[in-house]
């Protein structure tokens, strides 16, 4: 199973390839931490404000906060919303030390506007084919490189 770390989050929309993978024993030891596809990963320590979507069941390290959208909430909306907030996330984590650190409590206090379900549904209908194409293109690029 892919194990997402901050280096895996640079320059991509989806985490298609990761540097590290978990063994069966590793997966079993943290089974409640498995992220479903289209969860949104946000880096909050070190290089704070990186945002990616999970392409397949994965787990991540503690430097990453993951958002699994509820039924009826577009993961693409959440992804794009977090992308627009990435500079704010980075600033909130700056405390005078050299390492940016936005803890889960601070992260959960970020206020956002969530449109109505009908707007989110229409947004999802428009964005879904685009994000499917992005994922397909990322996978194709990896196949071509290998």
Regions found by a protein language model. Name each.
Residues 47, 53, 117-121:
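Long mid-to-C-terminal scaffolding/interaction modules that assemble large complexes
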Residues 7-10, 45, 86:
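Short, small-residue-rich loop/turn micro-motifs
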Residues 2-37, 55, 60:
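Sequence-specific dsDNA recognition surfaces
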Residues 13, 28-44, 50-51, 71-80, ...:
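Polybasic, glycine- and aromatic-enriched phosphate-binding surface used to engage nucleic acids
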Residues 72-73, 77-80, 84-91, 95-100, ...:
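Amphipathic alpha-helical coiled-coil/heptad-repeat segments
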Residues 62-64:
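Glycine- and aromatic-enriched periplasmic loops at the membrane-periplasm interface
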Residues 1-2, 114:
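Extended boundary segments
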